[in-house]
Curated annotation (Swiss-Prot):
It comes from the Bacteria. InterPro entries: Ribosomal_bL9, Ribosomal_bL9/RNase_H1_N, Ribosomal_bL9_bac/chp, Ribosomal_bL9_C, Ribosomal_bL9_C_sf, Ribosomal_bL9_N, Ribosomal_bL9_N_sf. Keywords: Ribonucleoprotein, Ribosomal protein, RNA-binding, rRNA-binding. Binds to the 23S rRNA. The gene is rplI. It holds the Pfam family Ribosomal_L9_N. This is Large ribosomal subunit protein bL9. Residues 153-186 are annotated as: Disordered.
Length: 186
């Protein structure tokens, strides 16, 4: 089945492209979420009329997503789970749990989060991908710990490391400013 994409979809193509997909994928996913329309002469003509509006809308969404992604720099999630002595947790970590943990500061749809094919069933540190836009994906560290005390200690370590990184960045900015001042004087 030929469809016209109404937005960029990483696995299919860009806005306005005509692509061939399986009928079930179109009926069950693309059409209900208004990501595509069936390619007919009428829909192609209508798309040409709306192309500039759709492109502007896509740029607006991209800008919003990039601002949101920038605010996620250095973010991490700590989840407390019951685990056996060898570190295996009872059950597994889900995207809903990560979204719930992030919801204290941000509103993130759990369907936009993935663990890159990894099942989180042990204690430790993992990476989760959050897709804000088809072109913008942010990595967030997910720490799975056994107790609240472990979580508290990890938060302290992370906050100290972030403070030291911020101080280093400020020192680098000051160093660059003095280097440029010296270059201007010569």
């Amino acid at each position: 089945m030929l469809v016209i994409l109404k937005e960029n979809i990483r696995t299919l193509g860009k806005l306005g492209e005509i692509v061939k997909v399986k009928p079930g994928y179109a009926r069950n996913f693309l059409f209900p979420q208004r990501k595509a329309v069936k390619a007919t002469k009428e829909s192609i003509a209508k798309l040409e009329e709306q192309r500039s509006f759709l492109e502007e809308e896509n740029i607006r969404k991209l800008n919003l997503a990039s601002e949101l992604a920038a605010s996620f720099a250095g973010k991490f999630v700590i989840l407390v789970k019951q685990a056996s002595e060898d570190g295996k947790i009872f059950g597994s970590v889900t995207t809903r749990e990560v979204a719930r943990s992030l919801s204290q500061e941000y509103e993130v749809d759990h369907r936009k989060i993935s663990f890159n094919g990894v099942k989180i069933r042990n204690l430790g540190e993992y990476q989760a991908s959050i897709e804000f836009h088809s072109e913008i994906v942010v990595q967030v560290a997910v720490h799975v710990v056994r107790s609240e005390t472990d979580a508290h200690e990890l938060r302290q370590v992370k906050s100290q490391s972030q403070k030291s990184q911020q101080q280093e960045a400020k020192q680098n900015e000051v160093g660059e400013a003095t280097d440029s001042d010296k270059a201007d004087q010569k």
